[in-house]
C-alpha cells in the first residue's frame, strides 16, 4: 500500500473485484483497486496498481499506481508510480514521476493555487 505523506487514514475503498459507475464526492482518502467510471472529488486519491479510473479528478493529492483516463487537478501533488499511467492533462504545483511511469497529456505546473487579485493603478 502506498504511504501518504500526511498520515491520514484510509476512509473509502473500492476493492480489486469491484466496479463503480457514477461520480464520487468524499472527504479524506479514497483508494481504488477496482474500476471506476465517473468524476472524483476527494481530499486524497490513491489508485492501486490494478486500479483504473475513467473520469476527471479534483483532489489535494493524487498517487497513481494504476491508470487514470481524464483530467487530474491536484492542489498539492501528483505522484505517478513506476507502473502508473495518466492519459489526460494534469494541473498541480508538484509532480513526481517514477521511472517507467507514463504521462500522455499536458502538465501545467502552478506555483500557488491561490488566486491573487491585482489592484488597478490609475494613470496620473
Residue ranges and their predicted role:
Residues 40:
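Short, small/polar residue-rich loop motifs at catalytic or cofactor-binding pockets
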Residues 1-25, 29-31, 35-37, 46-52, ...:
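Intrinsically disordered, low-complexity terminal regions
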